[in-house]
């Protein structure tokens, strides 16, 4: 280590952060949103770099979607202090504005490495990371080159028939979002024993769109550490990012460790995060074939997860299914009616689900109230009867993620009814539910127990049918007993929770 290195007056991360802030101010907001590009602050970058477990020796580090290079700089700062002999950096970035600043940051990294007598090499690749990676992976006898990867990938959906989807399929990757595609490609380019740290939306932890991604991640890597923020806006406060983000650390080719370390903090600058160790089989339940990743941050959350996750039944055990409504309004516009008229049936939209009950019809509403009955719509309807409904997207004013309502058949004198595809409906093999079972489900789904449990499972406001299938439920007898205790007309949270706690002996 040179004498200058021992007297560095300012951290590399602080220098880089000033470059990041200057670059951020020059970015066009519309373009940034289009690219799904949100840069890591020095606090987030340090947090991520601190999760790596090995800095000694030689490092080949990949930073895909590098921005100004904040993540690489944070790694360099740690590695030079902790025994690194050489660092070879590969940064992918396609924005000219970012590349201009990235060059400056890598020059600072080079100076830092030289001062600590660490051999330094760098490469900036101004190409699309997905295309370049696929081309690499398809080379005969390809051998992974990186032993470190640090990522803050773009957050954008991938079109079902888009160019990216076709490229990814060539190397066996199914991805619905750029962020999962970037992480999946980085994993494939890591050597066995290589470490990956990424910050992404939490949405990959559950839901059908990320099944393939979770399977690849957990098949090929050990999930070792997770860092969660207690506020949606904590990680990217300056960028108005409302997604709930998490940071995670993986080791490729390592047998899954028995314990996952979960860190939680109020924000990236929090110097005293809560640290909680959780058995892996409580993070990823063995009885969940979709490999949902269930994050608990303290003993209270763990107890709640064990209570809710330890309930005896699946939906199939109860003879119940949950499906998404069949009516996609824009595909059958000609068969929609604002008013309930002759030869039509009720069409239930999220607007009709209010305070855990159904309000129908709604005059002067934005959405229709009825569906015309004809050959084109016959397969979009279900038999009129009792169903439990939930919104797929939670309204901003709702305090709970799952808001359940009971649909009763006496709403109209009809044989069938239509449910919009932004609604989930519980049914018995396509037919209505028994009243006692429906009431029991209604109480259970609207309980604080399930709301808290669902928030642990789910990092966004969507409530998909797959998520509802993944829940555990009381027995049929317990649900019927719960229904018998409902002696109130309008929704009352306190009474709902009292019934659930007493009936399921959760106190």
Curated annotation (Swiss-Prot):
GO MF annotations in UniProt: DNA binding; site-specific DNA-methyltransferase (adenine-specific) activity
Keywords assigned: DNA-binding, Methyltransferase, Restriction system, S-adenosyl-L-methionine, Transferase
Keyword Repressor attributed: no
Taxonomic superkingdom: Bacteria
Pfam family, one: Eco57I
Subunit structure: Monomer.
UniProt-recorded name of the protein: Type II methyltransferase M.PstI
Organism of this sequence: Providencia stuartii
